Amino acid sequence: MILSQRIQSLTASPIRKLSPYADAAKAAGKKVYHLNIGQPDIATPAQFMDSVREFQAPVIAYSNSKGEMFLLKAVQKYYAEKGMDYAIEDIFVTNGGSEALIFAVMALCDPGDEIMVFEPFYANYTTFCKEFGAKINAVPTSVENGYHLPSEEEIEKHITPKTKAILLTNPGNPTGVVYTEAEQDMISRIVRRHNLALIADEVYREFVYDGAYRSFGTMPELDDNLIIIDSVSKRYSACGARIGCIISKNKELSKQVIKCCQARLCSPILEQVGAAALYTTPASYLEEVNKEYKKRRDTIVAALKKLPGVKASDPKGAFYIMVNMPVDDAEKFAIWTLENFAIDGETVMFAPGNGFYNTPGSGINEARLAYVLKSEDLERAIYILGEALKAYPGRVEK
């Protein structure tokens, strides 16, 4: 058979593509500390499995393409409690936040159109765009500025006739940046001035450790431009449930998104049952989880500061941190570490940073670390990382 150029143009995920090396290390008897993926180790609330066990149905039948009403109402109530008034008609259940993003790109872009992002950015955005022939229009940010946005003038320089949307992750993955209200107001002006869509990926909104957080959904002037992407994956430590949603008050968008939902038939009914139950989780659960991640953030930042030649960002939210390392190539270093380095039978895995950039050559000596392990495991993992840096043949002294 002859495969399409489109599928061959897709890039492997920097988060998962080194998994064969980690699997080989484990097969050789090594313990691998996984800092490469945002898979929380915090227990999923018991409500999820309890509700699934209690679910009674003679047949596991197709569910509503838009999502079951009990879940739609649970999502609606969650947003209402946060000051956002969405109608049931504005909410569509998806197979994770990833499918919500795919639907957004499909609804907005024809081949050759552009989605503006701020790099470094979540690596799968590139794949979601390429699947539909759309392009990433990447605007650089810097660690020196905490990965905050460039000026309004600088952003507008990058807008072209093909630009259809601005896609923001807030809080940021992989940077941990939390945008200020002034930055949000600036983005609001830009998208309305140029009649762009604003795709707000807010799946980490519960994880903010310093200062306040404002959802784009609380800005009524954006009602016609805004598409919110959400998910239960990180919020409730339910990544494998694959339940998310796409939300917008734009009625024309809603008419088109339902076609996508119908084409893939439905989201899994049992996962919808469990997800609806997660929305009944007491606020105290998220408060405790937030405290735990703040502790882990503080742990990894302190540990990284002890490593000579390593520069790290100061994340304010989510559970990721970008680090600049004294190496010739972070991907080569990651492979070398998994294949050739261990301390007492233990090694570490991380995501090479170049996969979070669109600009060729950027991020070559950077890595994204996910601080989703217990603090003592993070300290051990960063110690191993530091010792590996000392031993790595491709170390570059700065």
Language model: regions and residue ranges:
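Glycine-rich loop-to-alpha-helix module at the N-terminal edge of alpha/beta enzyme cores
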Residues: 35, 58-62, 74-77, 81
